[in-house]
């Protein structure tokens, strides 16, 4: 587009408002911004917002805010569609005693760059000269807005005071310019006297862009909003509303006809040909979906609908505002006051009707819940009410600067995308540590290099020569039934990979086309090759709750892989898991990702052994280990070595697993920006169904000497725990150290780095042992000291084993969820609906891991029983004087202790069949007991 064309002129508005309480005037602010067609930047003074409070304004994000005094407060809002905006953080520390904040819009092809500041200068205070010198020394275009509380005839005040003279001098000395046009910016509500106190200033570089200034009507404050308009020569190319294809709108008959009429695929003979066939399959399915499903506009986020009556009142309110503006231009103060009275009354009426409408919506949801029979739809309806109440975690601003551990910073969305990608590339590198065994690494690498036919396949080699193990069930023909079985375990609406093919689409494939896919997957198995296009991931980043989202490490990467590729991964994982189980190749200590194995058995085992130690007046020393980036840093050659040496799998199956790990890539997608493609040299792919099983194989051969020492070993995926019972703490620690030395040797060989800072040592004892100093453990170069509590598989164990910290935690979370029941109860939900919600939404918090704390002190279990009592009262709307037994009878609900006991008795039957440790504890639980008064979980369950 020609830069001189009128179409290339792009307006950019900055609006400053002294809001006098942003929460109180939030609705008025939203209406006003809508009337203005959503200006780009809003600066606010006197927000009067407590630091812990948050405020949301539709279509805007809060980039910067500050509260130095409860009566002050400043905030800058930026329209959500404006990218490349960062907060200027150093100004808060530079001027700690002043109310000033700032943001920067970075220079792009669409915007010349702009720095915007707002400050609030309290009455009778001389403006800080250092602020103006700082603003003057900045490069680029700068705007400073604020309520300066200074009067000067030069900007429209009725008089000039001492503060106004000082401010005028500062403006002149620092080459700043006033954009105001002498309009009054405040009207005293009592005397009607008008003054000009709010200003918008700019530097010389920005003056050439200035196109206009005007004053708007007050919105809940005695100050008038002031507007400044700049104009740039660029084309912002605003994005139109996006379109999408919805799977439920697909013409499935047409979809099947297109796929059935597709040409048959030539059977690939080499890995290179297999890659081409995989890409062709993706193209055919994608084109069939596009031709049979129309494009539709993306659905807008759910909003509470306004009634026609409310819309008419909002329209009338806007009309009154226009009349008030006209009266202000005529200086008709009496008429202005009369209209303002009408506006305020109408605003209160609108708020009242909105409140009634929200109540009506709640009643509608409650009625829908009472009628809904389908559990899935029941929970979807419930989440519409629950999510706004429970999810209080603030959404990170898109404008914040993100930094990584290496000191790199990213401001724009593209920079952030590349920053995340670079970090993931560094994480997925072959682990190196000065203590690792270099000779063993060379031996394993040489073994892999000297046996290329076992681990790798030539891209151009044909499958012709039979090999040992070709008749193994692992390499059997893939059937359509096997594909359907694995598809049935997948969520229909699961996120899709780069190819855009979902599980829902694959479930609708016709049988003839499914046979084509089954034949291709069989050939991949025989070739020992995993198609390259299925090894490329789209990675998105989700901030970890409760962590600082400005740190790149506090974002969790979610890899979206091809659903077609994940079907092959599921088939490989299913076959390999059955092979390992049938041949008893899993270590007895491993419970993670195995059929009929669960976290409960490991929690019960630890709790039971600790209670048995109490009975014999022993202490338990437990070590909970944390492997650094466990899944992300698995040594690939180490995995290949173990597949061949430890499991003796067929060569072709080893090759396809090796191919699955080799040459994997990802691209980070962050707020519409793609990073460069990065390679992953180590680790298992996140989000893959096969990755957990590969990790289990990698850690399946922990040293047997650990168990021979008399230590108990528990593995659940990457959660590893060691513990032992002893008569003294020192002896228990010494046994743990010996076992840890064996484990450390294994880690040095297999290049696993244990994190000493995150590993926890817990001494569990009810004895009053007098020791001058508790011994510590040494792990590599780290010293591990005892801690009062440690979390294991989601349950908080403490040194006295009374589970007070854990019960306090789950009780706190349950009480938050109980608020949802209270809201629904007020909305008219039926008692049966509320009790049903308690059973599916709150009680599971108490049930998980309950086998471990079943023998907790009575006063601790009573705490969660009280929460259940309150839930029943809320559900049945019962007064506080009704007896607890009668309440439970009315709700047809057992006491929580009885419920947990019955539940764990059923679990114990399954556990005893699969875990010999629990079976042994059950048979010998009373042997050598010195303290028979101590009750263990198995004493309650058996």
Kindly give the residue locations of the regions a language model identified:
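Basic/polar low-complexity segments
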Residues: 174, 196-197, 204, 229-235, ...
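Non-catalytic, peripheral interaction segments enriched in hydrophobic/basic residues
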Residues: 297-298, 303-306, 587, 716-717, ...
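Active-site palm subdomain of RNA-directed nucleic acid polymerases
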Residues: 132-145, 572-590, 615, 692-727
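A shared catalytic/ligand-binding motif for oxyanion handling
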Residues: 1-352, 565, 707, 712, ...
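Short amphipathic alpha-helical interface segments
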Residues: 277-280, 436, 500-501, 535-538, ...
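Conserved pre-catalytic core of RNA-dependent polymerases
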Residues: 424, 469-685, 724
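Catalytic palm active-site di-aspartate
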Residues: 146-149, 223, 497, 536-539, ...
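Conserved, non-catalytic sequence blocks in retroelement Pol enzymes and Pol-derived host proteins
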Residues: 67, 154-164, 186-192, 218-220, ...
């Amino acid at each position: 587009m020609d830069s001189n064309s009128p179409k290339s002129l792009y307006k950019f508005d900055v609006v400053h408002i002294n809001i006098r309480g942003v929460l109180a005037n939030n609705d008025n602010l939203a209406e006003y911004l809508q009337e203005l067609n959503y200006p780009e930047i809003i600066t606010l003074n006197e927000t009067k917002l407590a630091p812990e409070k948050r405020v949301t304004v539709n279509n805007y994000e809060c980039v910067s805010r500050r509260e130095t005094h409860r009566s002050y407060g400043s905030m800058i809002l930026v329209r959500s569609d404006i990218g490349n905006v960062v907060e200027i953080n150093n100004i808060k520390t530079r001027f700690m005693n002043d109310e000033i904040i700032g943001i920067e819009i970075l220079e792009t092809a669409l915007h010349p760059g702009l720095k915007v500041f707002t400050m609030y200068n309290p009455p009778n205070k001389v403006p800080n000269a250092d602020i103006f010198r700082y603003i003057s020394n900045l490069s680029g275009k700068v705007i400073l807005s604020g309520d300066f509380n200074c009067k000067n005839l030069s900007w429209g005040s009725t008089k000039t005071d001492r503060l106004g003279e000082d401010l005028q001098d500062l403006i002149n000395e620092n080459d700043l310019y006033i954009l105001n046009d002498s309009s009054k910016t405040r009207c005293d509500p009592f005397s009607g006297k008008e003054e000009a106190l709010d200003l918008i200033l700019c530097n010389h570089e920005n003056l050439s862009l200035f196109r206009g200034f005007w004053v708007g009507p007050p919105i809940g404050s005695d100050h008038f909003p002031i507007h400044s308009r700049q104009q740039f020569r660029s084309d912002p190319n605003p994005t139109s509303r996006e379109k999408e294809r919805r799977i439920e709108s697909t013409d499935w008959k047409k979809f099947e006809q297109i796929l059935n009429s597709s040409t048959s695929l030539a059977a690939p003979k080499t890995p290179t040909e297999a890659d081409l066939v995989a890409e062709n399959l993706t193209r055919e399915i994608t084109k069939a979906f596009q031709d049979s499903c129309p494009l539709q506009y993306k659905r807008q986020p759910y909003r509470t609908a306004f009634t026609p009556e409310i819309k008419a009142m909002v329209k009338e309110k806007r009309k009154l505002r226009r009349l008030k503006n006209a009266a202000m231009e005529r200086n008709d103060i009496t008429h202005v006051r009369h209209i303002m009275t009408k506006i305020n009354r109408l605003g209160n009426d609108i708020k009242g009707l909105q409140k009634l409408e929200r109540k009506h919506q709640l009643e509608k949801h409650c009625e829908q819940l009472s009628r809904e029979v389908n559990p899935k739809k029941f929970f979807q309806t419930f989440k519409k009410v629950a999510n706004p109440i429970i999810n209080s975690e603030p959404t990170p601003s898109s404008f914040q600067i993100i930094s990584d551990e290496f000191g790199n910073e990213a401001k724009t969305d593209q920079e952030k995308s590349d920053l995340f990608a670079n970090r993931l590339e560094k994480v997925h590198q072959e682990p190196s540590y000065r203590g690792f065994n270099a000779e063993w690494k060379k031996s394993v690498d040489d073994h892999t290099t000297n046996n290329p036919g076992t681990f790798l396949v030539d891209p151009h080699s044909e499958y012709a020569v039979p090999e040992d193990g070709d008749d193994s069930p692992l390499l059997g023909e893939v059937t359509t039934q096997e594909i359907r079985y694995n598809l049935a375990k997948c969520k229909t609406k699961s996120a899709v990979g780069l190819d855009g093919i979902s599980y829902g689409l694959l479930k609708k494939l016709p049988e003839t086309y499914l046979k084509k896919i089954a034949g291709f997957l069989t050939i991949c198995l025989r070739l020992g090759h995993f198609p390259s296009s299925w090894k490329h991931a789209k990675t998105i980043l989700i901030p970890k709750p409760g962590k600082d989202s400005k740190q790149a490490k506090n974002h969790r990467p979610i890899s979206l892989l091809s659903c077609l590729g994940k079907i092959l991964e599921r088939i490989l994982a299913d076959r390999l898991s059955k092979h390992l189980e049938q041949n008893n190749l899993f270590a007895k200590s491993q419970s993670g990702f195995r059929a009929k194995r669960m976290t409960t058995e490991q929690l019960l085992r630890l709790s039971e052994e600790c209670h048995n130690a109490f009975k014999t007046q022993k202490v338990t020393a437990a070590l909970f280990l944390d492997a650094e980036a466990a899944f992300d840093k698995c040594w690939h050659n180490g995995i290949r070595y173990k597949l061949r040496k430890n499991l003796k799998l067929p060569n072709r199956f080893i090759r396809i697993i090796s191919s699955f790990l080799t040459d994997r890539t990802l691209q980070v997608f962050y707020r519409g920006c793609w990073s460069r493609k990065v390679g992953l040299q180590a680790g298992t792919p996140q989000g893959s169904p096969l990755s957990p099983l590969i990790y289990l194989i990698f850690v399946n051969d922990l040293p047997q000497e650990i168990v021979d020492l008399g230590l108990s070993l528990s593995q659940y995926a990457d959660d590893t725990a060691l513990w032992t019972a002893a008569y003294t703490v020192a002896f228990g620690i010494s046994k743990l150290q010996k076992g840890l030395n064996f484990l450390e040797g294994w880690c040095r060989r297999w290049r696993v780095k244990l994190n000493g800072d995150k590993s926890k040592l817990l001494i569990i004892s009810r004895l009053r042992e007098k020791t001058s100093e508790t011994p510590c453990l040494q792990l590599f170069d780290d010293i591990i000291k005892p801690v009062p509590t440690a979390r294991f598989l989601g349950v908080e164990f403490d040194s006295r084993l009374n589970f007070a910290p854990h019960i306090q935690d789950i009780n706190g979370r349950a009480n938050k969820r109980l608020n949802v029941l209270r809201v629904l109860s007020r909305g008219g939900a039926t008692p049966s609906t509320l009790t049903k919600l308690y059973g599916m939404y709150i009680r599971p918090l108490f049930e998980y891991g309950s086998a471990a704390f079943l023998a907790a002190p009575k006063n601790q279990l009573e705490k969660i029983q009280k929460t259940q009592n309150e839930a029943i009262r809320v559900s049945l709307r019962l007064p506080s004087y009704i007896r607890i037994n009668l309440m439970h009878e009315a709700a047809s609900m057992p006491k929580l202790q009885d419920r947990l006991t019955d539940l764990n008795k059923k679990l114990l039957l399954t556990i005893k069949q699969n875990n010999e440790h629990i079976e042994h504890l059950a048979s010998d639980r009373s042997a050598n007991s010195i303290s028979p008064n101590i009750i263990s979980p198995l004493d309650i369950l058996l």
